[in-house]
Amino acid sequence: ANEIKLILQRAKLYPLAQPLATIDARQIEDVLKSSPFVNDAQCYKTQSGQVCIQLTQRTPVMRVKADNGDDYYVDNHGGVMPNTKYTSDLIVATGQINKWFAQNYISLLSKSLMVNELWRNQIEQINVLPDRSIELVPRVGNHIVYIGRLPECSSKRKREEDINNFVNKKMDRLEKFYKYGLSQAGWNK
């Protein structure tokens, strides 16, 4: 709320104590939508003289810390969000990542991992190798999980479906290994 107030104050659009006739709801919407953290903004004036502002926030699904020095977040729609002073418990993607690959492939991998409670808690890092194959780094245990290259497709819908199926198949196998293999040998072997 304070960040929104600051955005509106900087743009000289903060509506508190302003005459209703001087408040431009459309301009408030446009300024708020230009924020990298706002997905959508609706602003309107009521019959009773109030100004209502409704926001939907962009939801980061991973943080990218690429070998080339890039450091940013990617949201659930594949959009890039700048790094901020706020921290979030998200999967960190590292390695040979450009923004296009992060937005179109790694974000889909991260989304697929985040919907499963086990993987949301167990996987802390995605590492992209020079050949674009993927390694996953778990929080628990002294091992790296190599899952290979993600399926490539030009259609966004098909790509999302293919990556989700690929991840589910790989992670189902990994879960069985954890359940039946590591339960016998131990996590740190």
Residue ranges and their predicted role:
Residues I7-S34, N39-K189:
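Charged, solvent-exposed interaction patches on well-folded alpha/beta domains
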